[in-house]
Amino acid sequence: MAKPQATVLIIGAGISGLTTSRLLTNSGIPNIVFEASTPDRSQGFAISLQEFGYSALLSALGDLPLSSLIRGVAPDREIGGTGWIDQALRDNCTGELLVAPDLTTAKQTVVRANRNALRRWIADCGEEELDVRYGHKLQSVEGTVGDITAVFENKARYRGSLVVAADGVNSTIRSQVLPGVVPETIPLIHYHGEFQLSRTAFDELIRPHSGHSNILVGVGDGFNTPLSICNMTKTQVHLDWSYSRTVTGDDDLLYRPNLPSEEAKQIPPALVKELAALALAEPWKRFLNPESLKSHRVFHWTTRCVYMTQDDARRAGEQGVVFVGDSWHAMPIFGGEGGNHALLDGVELADAVVKVVASPGKDHLSKAVASYYAGAWKRSQEAVRRSTQRFFLLHRPAAEWKEIAEKKKKAV
């Protein structure tokens, strides 16, 4: 098979960037991944992988079995778990089960995955090691498709055939080649906390409520408080919680969308006061309270979405840039599908590149980019809208949740 004349340059070692790199590498197409952070960076929280996302990845990797993915990424993999979630919604002020999906089917369709473990698993799914270069923060790109150069803040310069923008919601590449495409800040409050428990404490305090589910979703009167397993061993459990709600008005003390990174790690007094007034049920009240917060790592997350028109994507392609992941379809984390579409982006882009490189003729990469966007643009942009709508629906008033629960009971 003929190879492209120059290397594909992938900016960002997240899910979409590593998926693209792994599949190109497995097909013999040279590529380099550049990552601004250090190798020890951590994003150890868990995400939900849906069948449409992981099945495409497993197929592209040579029809690997689902069990291989589960053994590598499930938060409870070290104790023989499968990353299973019950997909139930509970009233976080009473503990009452509001929405309970039919669990009579034996097939598991959603898999919780630890993000760190997922990145490692993707990177390891091949005989040849990926070329990932850390400490490379992008400064600019220059050139056109087939001949483009990436310039980094450490003065390094790399020439390639195509730049894959896998650099996230605040994409440096997007801000340069498409300065008019800016992330849209969603009027939502979202705080994320991380903490640890011994297995004994977990089995005593959380397991009676969650069963074997890797996430315990609590919904309240316009706010949510999910508890999620990030990683579990025989002796220790790493967990996180989220507190999210819509903005109440212009004077909302917790709506701070443009916080500096250091301030985003501080616990504001308004959050402590608000959590104390929620009157939560067990197990949520044990962890989302002023005293417990003192021992948790707490982060303020700003929810941003990115929309991109087909014309925008095409113009970037003419400059040698193609987008994957959050750089062009960022969506809410809770209730979102971002990780799944990041996987699909990597699968579909790599497939498009492999097909055109193997075919005769010129303008290989221009054709690959056009082919990729022909399917990926509509899929991903619809997902952004769908996920944003779902986020607001998941933060509905308590009266609506109770109405839904009553209708479910009558339908049985």
Curated annotation (Swiss-Prot):
Gene3D superfamilies referenced in this protein's UniProt entry, alphabetically: FAD/NAD(P)-binding domain (3.50.50.60)
Keywords: FAD, Flavoprotein, Glycoprotein, Monooxygenase, Oxidoreductase, Signal
N-terminal signal peptide: 1-21
Keyword Membrane among UniProt keywords: no
Enzyme Commission number(s) from the entry: 1.-.-.-
Top EC class of this enzyme: oxidoreductase
Glycosylation-annotated residues: N92, N170, N231
Sequence positions that bind FAD: E35, A46, R119, D326, G339
Pathway: Secondary metabolite biosynthesis
Superkingdom of source: Eukaryota
GO function terms (MF aspect): FAD binding; monooxygenase activity
Cofactor dependence: FAD
InterPro entries membership: FAD-bd (IPR002938), FAD/NAD-bd_sf (IPR036188)
Presence of keyword Flavoprotein: yes
Main function: FAD-dependent monooxygenase; part of the gene cluster that mediates the biosynthesis of neosartoricin B, a prenylated anthracenone that probably exhibits T-cell antiproliferative activity, suggestive of a physiological role as an immunosuppressive agent. The non-reducing polyketide synthase nscA probably synthesizes and cyclizes the decaketide backbone. The hydrolase nscB then mediates the product release through hydrolysis followed by spontaneous decarboxylation. The prenyltransferase nscD catalyzes the addition of the dimethylallyl group to the aromatic C5.
Similarity section: Belongs to the paxM FAD-dependent monooxygenase family.
Protein name as annotated: FAD-dependent monooxygenase nscC
Organism from which the protein derives: Arthroderma otae (strain ATCC MYA-4605 / CBS 113480)
Taxonomic lineage from the root: Eukaryota, Fungi, Dikarya, Ascomycota, Pezizomycotina
UniProt gene name: nscC
